[in-house]
Amino acid sequence: MKTLKLSLLSLIALTFLGFKADETPLEKLLKQLAKITATYPQEKVHIHLDKPYYTVGEDIWLKAYLVTAEKNEPSLLSTVLYVDLIDNKNSIKKKITLSVDKGIASGNISLLDSLSSGMYRIRAYTNYMRNYNQDLFFEKFIAIGSVADNKIAKKVEDKKVEFGIQFFPEGGNLIGGIRSKVGFKAVTADGLGANLSGYIVNKNKEKVAEFTAEHAGMGIFAILPQSNEQYTAIVTLADNSIKSFKLPAVLESGHALAVNSTAENLSIRISSTADLVQGKDVFVVAQVNGIVYASFTSKVDKAILTANIAKKVFPTGIVQVSLFDANSKPIAERLVFVNHNDQLKIDVTNTTEAVTKKKANLALN
């Protein structure tokens, strides 16, 4: 009987190993992604403040809502929330920790008299959120002023606007010979969007593209980068000050990922340099909040590959489209917002006439 048990266990093991061997590379990749999501769950936090601006010496009263990225449900993963008050020099001026109970936390930040007036940033995160990029931390800019004294105010001389700008090539990289869209975001030292315009030049100072910030310091332009070139952005601000910034280096070899949103589909376009057109597999995975909703394998047997994914397979939200090479290494990524206009429509009716400050009854429909 003992021998029979060993034989059965061996058979189960062999069957399991056989199943593993029959897995496609894409199936293995999806299992790896699922394991990462389970091992390092994502959380999101949103904070409500009691008002939009403050004075030195006051308290910032806040309430935080911590949810799972996967289902937007109250998170039970973290019991501590970290909240930082950061000045416009990126220096942390105050740090507090809040106890989280069933996804809810509340508290206050005392604004010491030693604080200078200006724009500050509220940043909130949990230990789990540290497993991912800090771009996923909650951030909000607030204005903090100081009480004016009775002294005669001195005339403040005009200062040049200090700002920074970041460039985001579509898919992550500029690749020689492949036309690409490049997004940009420009912010002032106060964290506000910078109103600017400019153009792109190559190393011979030849103009190859122009751009203008369209909203909150953000915009987009198209460029056909060439290998062995270095591109520079010449930027002009509203005060006519001019600065130059280097664009990311151009790669000689690589795959570029472009995703366009049409009425019904996400249109996927994979462009490859000639040296990579060898018939090897690449994998495309589309997920929302860590859940994979679509995936496929394609062979790079030509310079441009296209495919469509129906938008109806995704819930409303940000779709992360990732491109992996034959070794399951991520090589490009795009984020696209899918909106099915299925948000809750709530009408609020005040059932009592508000004459003075008092408790009021609201009807939600």
Where are the model-predicted features located?
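Bacterial Sec-dependent N-terminal signal peptides
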Residues: 1-30, 364
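A structural signal for beta-strand and strand-to-loop patches characteristic of beta-rich domains
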Residues: 24-365
